Design a protein with these regions (language model features):
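Metalloprotease/metallohydrolase-associated module, dominated by Zn2+-dependent proteases
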Residues: 2-48, 53, 59-62, 82-208
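Active-site recognition of the HExxH zinc-binding catalytic motif
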Residues: 67-80
Length: 208
């Protein structure tokens, strides 16, 4: 893997040796990308090229970056064994992801709060770590620069904009399971927004 030295900058120091060993066993091209609101990373099977490819967002903290890398590397191993004949996040992928993650958890690579949430998430890993509120919140504790707050943290009735889409001006409403009914003051329409969405509070200016 020709760009491992670039990858070293983004992962915890304690993980460098093991990640290097994984990449020697499973060569893949890794490309660091800009922020993508819809995903942290992805795996691309490129059978006509020498290496397959993994892309990972540049703005993740080291622990989020490492989890994303292992998530995508599990896709590589699943593809090598099954190509497109199994579900992307089915039992085969879960098996590889658990196997890859286990030594990093055992070697205390992650802080205690992240490790605790990660152990719960890894009991049955989902397609995205965003599906685990406790994991998302623990990982945010280690962000150097937070772009906003979580919708869960905003008081009911407050107004806000999304971090990645400033076109809407929402008022936070009632909660149903993991989402809030939010009213867009511009379009006068209602939307259901995840409590884990990153938002920026907005102070309303009231006319007299």
């Amino acid at each position: 893997m020709k760009n491992f030295h670039l990858l070293e900058q983004f992962i915890p120091n304690a993980a460098v040796q093991r990640v290097n060993s994984l990449l020697k066993s499973h060569p893949v091209n890794i490309r660091i990308t800009g922020r993508r609101a819809s995903k942290y990373g992805d795996f691309r099977a490129l059978p006509d090229e020498h290496f397959h490819a993994i892309t990972i967002n540049h703005d993740l903290n080291p622990y989020s970056f490492l989890i994303t890398f292992l998530h995508e590397l599990a896709h590589l191993l699943t593809w090598k064994n099954h190509q497109n004949n199994v579900s992307p996040h089915g039992k085969e992928w879960k098996m590889h992801f658990k196997h890859l993650m286990h030594p990093f958890i055992e070697e205390h690579i992650f802080p205690d709060d992240v490790k605790h949430a990660l152990l719960h998430y890894m009991s049955d890993p989902a397609a995205s770590s965003c599906s685990s509120p406790s994991l998302i919140k623990s990982l945010r504790n280690h962000d150097k620069r937070k772009k906003g707050i979580l919708l869960d943290e905003l008081a009911a009735g407050s107004t806000f904009r999304m971090v990645d889409n400033k076109n809407f001006l929402f008022r936070k409403g009632e909660k149903a399971r993991k989402r809030y009914k939010c009213f867009d003051l511009n379009s006068r329409r209602e939307y259901w927004v995840s409590g884990l969405a990153e938002i920026v509070p907005v102070q309303e200016t009231l006319g007299i």
